[in-house]
């Protein structure tokens, strides 16, 4: 899935809501992984995803800024930033190559992996009960954004506490309108 970003009108920017009908209840231990490829455009900043808890209480943001070879993972509670984890690496965060992203959520923290590099966010999602997964642009009442980075995504997978895949979006099939037609 290739995101339409800053080169198009805000209303035409890519939005992918993995939980359009209802939020997911995953417990305190689960994982999310996917592949991301960065494209070079004039503006390279934007929200890859927002994982929102209980509709408004907390949010985990993944922000890409390819111009600076930088990924930010920011945990917000209410209107405050709880923690910010940066990956800045011009050898790993490069355009036109697939980069593996994996987040492992536990009660102790969130292990974030970008290819082989790993960092730990010492705050957990233990107070996150129902989760919404929003990629790119979204119209959420509290976490609305149209800042979409020029990226492509594939192979989004959610794992349960036993490491078993419970959801998989390959993002390989599209119609002429750009809508994803994958199996879920």
Specify the residue positions occupied by each region the protein language model found:
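Short, aromatic/His-centered strand-loop micro-motif at the edge of beta-sheets
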Residues: 75-100
């Amino acid at each position: 899935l290739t995101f339409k970003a800053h080169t198009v009108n805000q209303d035409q920017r890519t939005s992918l809501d993995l939980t359009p009908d209802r939020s997911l209840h995953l417990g305190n231990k689960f994982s999310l992984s996917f592949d991301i490829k960065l494209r070079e455009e004039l503006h390279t900043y934007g929200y890859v995803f927002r994982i929102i808890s209980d509709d408004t209480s907390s949010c985990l943001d993944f922000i890409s800024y390819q111009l600076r070879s930088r990924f930010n993972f920011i945990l917000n509670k209410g209107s405050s930033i709880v923690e910010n984890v940066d990956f800045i690496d011009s050898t790993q965060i490069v355009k036109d190559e697939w980069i593996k992203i994996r987040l492992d959520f536990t009660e102790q923290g969130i292990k974030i992996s970008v290819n082989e590099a790993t960092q730990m966010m010492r705050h957990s999602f233990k107070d996150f009960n129902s989760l919404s997964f929003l990629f790119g642009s979204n119209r959420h009442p509290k976490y609305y954004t149209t800042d979409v980075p020029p990226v492509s995504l594939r192979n989004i997978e959610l794992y349960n506490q036993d490491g078993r895949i419970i959801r998989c979006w390959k993002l390989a099939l599209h119609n002429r309108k750009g809508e994803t037609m994958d199996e879920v």
